[in-house]
Amino acid sequence: MGFYISSLLICVFLGIVRFASAGTYSSSYEAHRNYLLNIFHNPFVNDSIKERNIPELIAFYHRYPTEVPLSDEDRQQFERFIHDYREYRRVLIDGVPPQGGSFGNIFGHFLGRVGTRYILSLFNKQREEGLSNQATNSTIPPLRIQYLTKLS
């Protein structure tokens, strides 16, 4: 009898935890997606900032693999980019990963093909859902960047 009661309590506990974390997943997803859109879909953000955030984009892709609609070909190309990126970062020069140089070529190839489609799919999905006002204005730069461009 004790086994059944403890099993029931565990099931109830897991149900409560799952229910409580359901809203967290959605808000975490939205925050992460908005962050990436503000970086990769913003023409005012330079390439070096985008390059530094590629690991964040890859983490997002792995954390939410089915959330962004991609064709099978685009998904394969993105997986190939991730593989190439990791191989590039794995190469050590004097015990340290490369600090620039030819990586711009990999990044340029990524932005020109797969990355643009992935970010546009991410942006279009957000626009279709119509979840927030920022979704329709994601190409507007953040206030700090607007301020900096006014000073120039």
From Swiss-Prot:
Any one cellular-component term (Gene Ontology): extracellular space
GO biological process terms on file: cellular response to heat; cellular response to oxidative stress; innate immune response; response to bacterium; response to heat; response to oxidative stress
Record flagged with keyword Signal: yes
Signal peptide range: 1-22
Pfam families, alphabetized: Turandot
Main localization, broad class: secreted
Listed InterPro entries: Turandot
Compartments in which it is found: Secreted
Keywords: Immunity, Innate immunity, Secreted, Signal
Top-level lineage group: Eukaryota
Family note: Belongs to the Turandot family.
Function (record text): A humoral factor that may play a role in stress tolerance.
Protein name: Protein Turandot X
Lineage of the organism: Eukaryota, Metazoa, Ecdysozoa, Arthropoda, Hexapoda
Gene: TotX
